[in-house]
């Protein structure tokens, strides 16, 4: 839906802009205002009370969503020998080193996550300028540089997502699909909030969750009560 389309305006009119919705109510509103032409992706945008310019306030991490993401995740793995075999058996979409790196250097980035064994990182560094800006560069902090590639592939395929605050202290994450129940979306939201609370920098002062908005692909944003940090599936 274009923000100027009749369908978008009709959907936006269903949202009470002056209300702060509970996570469950927000999920219900997002489902009701999502496109009926396809199974839209549901996302959340969170503005954190941090200063990303300070290294100790650069919030980033991963979380396994209890209900998955609802989308097919394409995973590539930089590995050789037994590790490559393990990655293939775990369901990785593309596994390799030299040929894979050459393919990426040629502009191919048709995948959602990249994993590498530690011994391959020097080679992977050759495509850092391609992967980095897209958030695809393997990193030990997100569990994507590992010797247990099978576990990493299984986790990502099963609903593990990565998140990172941007320069404006905003963070975006997928919560699932509009076909999910509102309870499933609220549970996934709760898992993300729990992990963000665990990662809260000790040097961060004031309100940690400044603004939270839930929305579907091209749908209107639904303001979420940013003071709710538990009991995510309770009714309003």
Swiss-Prot record:
GO terms for molecular function: rRNA binding; structural constituent of ribosome; tRNA binding. One of its GO terms (biological process) is translation. It comes from the Bacteria. The keyword Calcium does not apply. One of its GO terms (cellular component) is large ribosomal subunit. InterPro entries: Ribosom_uL1_bac-type (IPR005878), Ribosomal_uL1 (IPR002143), Ribosomal_uL1-like (IPR023674), Ribosomal_uL1/biogenesis (IPR028364), Ribosomal_uL1_3-a/b-sand (IPR016095), Ribosomal_uL1_CS (IPR023673). Keywords: Repressor, Ribonucleoprotein, Ribosomal protein, RNA-binding, rRNA-binding, Translation regulation, tRNA-binding. Pfam families: Ribosomal_L1 (PF00687). Belongs to the universal ribosomal protein uL1 family. Part of the 50S ribosomal subunit. Binds directly to 23S rRNA. The L1 stalk is quite mobile in the ribosome, and is involved in E site tRNA release. This is Large ribosomal subunit protein uL1. It comes from Corynebacterium jeikeium (strain K411).
């Amino acid at each position: 839906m274009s923000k100027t389309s009749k369908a978008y305006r009709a959907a936006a009119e269903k949202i009470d802009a002056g209300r702060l919705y509970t996570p469950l109510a927000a999920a219900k509103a997002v489902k009701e205002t999502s496109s009926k032409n396809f199974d839209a992706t549901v996302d959340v945008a969170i503005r954190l009370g941090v200063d990303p310019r300070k290294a100790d306030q650069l919030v980033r991490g991963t979380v396994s969503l209890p209900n998955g993401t609802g989308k097919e995740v394409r995973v590539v793995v930089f590995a050789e020998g037994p590790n490559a075999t393990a990655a293939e058996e775990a369901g990785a979409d593309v596994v390799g080193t030299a040929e894979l790196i050459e393919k990426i250097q040629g502009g191919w980035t048709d995948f959602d996550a990249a994993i590498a064994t530690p011994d391959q990182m020097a080679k992977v560094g050759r495509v850092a300028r391609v992967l980095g800006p897209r958030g695809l560069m393997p990193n030990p902090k997100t569990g994507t540089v590992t010797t247990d590639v099978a576990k990493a592939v299984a986790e990502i395929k099963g609903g593990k997502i990565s998140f990172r605050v941007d320069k404006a202290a905003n963070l975006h994450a997928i919560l699932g699909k509009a076909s999910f129940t509102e309870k499933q979306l609220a549970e996934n939201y709760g898992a993300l909030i729990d992990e963000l609370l665990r990662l809260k920098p000790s040097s961060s002062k004031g309100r940690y969750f400044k603004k939270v908005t839930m929305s579907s692909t091209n749908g209107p944003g639904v303001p979420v009560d940013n003071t709710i940090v538990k009991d995510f599936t309770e009714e309003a």
